[in-house]
Amino acid sequence: MIKAVVFDLDNTLYSYDANHAYGMEALEGYCRETFGITEEETQEYYRKAGYIMANRIGTDTAAIHSRMLRLQCMMELLEKPLFPHVQKMYHIYWDAFLQHIEPNPGVLDFLMELRKRKIRIGIGTDMTAYIQYKKLEAIGAEVYIDFMVTSEEAGVEKPHYHLFELCVEKAGVRAEECVFIGDNVKKDIEGAWESGLRGIWYTQEKEPTERRYFPTLRSFTEINVDDFLTQQ
């Protein structure tokens, strides 16, 4: 019997890809007006900044997702002053991102039904904590969340077992009583199963492109909650 359901956040409860595009569009506008560079040049500097970050801090850390650090690296590449641009660009990106964010179809109804059945609901996510809280508030999911585990708190990124251990610890149940739903096969699903949780691959409204030996979920609108809780 399932007693807790833990969700990845980005590209699971909402579309990260769509909202990142809005954030980048706003960032490109600022760079065009302020530095006189094209959208393509902004994107290239943004990519190069990501490579620099990976070399400096590694990839198994929440800091790799920090937009503040990414934009700081961009200013270093452009040889522009850090102040006031880094903070301005940070807020421009995230304001545009959050302005357009919406939950994926069926997500809030599913969370509500889990809450009615007294199922513990958590988030297990690779990212810094503050912005993940903002995203959950923006999609209206915050009222359903019992616990959070970010890679910033865990000190490691998925699929490291420690992040999943923290999810189970905070859920207050056994690992086998805990489902983990996410969009990334390696990080979310294989990581969950290898840590003793039941991983379910959310395929983002698409049919799986390859055969997998674990459960899949195409859409949150298709879930019969009682069957879901007893059949997993």
For the regions a language model picked out, list residue spans one by one.
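Asp-based, Mg2+/Mn2+-dependent phosphohydrolase catalytic module
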Residues: M1-V5, A18, E33, E40, ...
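N-terminal helical cap/lid subdomain that shapes the substrate entry/recognition surface
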Residues: I2-P105
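Short glycine/proline-enriched coil/turn segments at helix->beta-strand junctions
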Residues: E76-E79, R117, R212-Y213
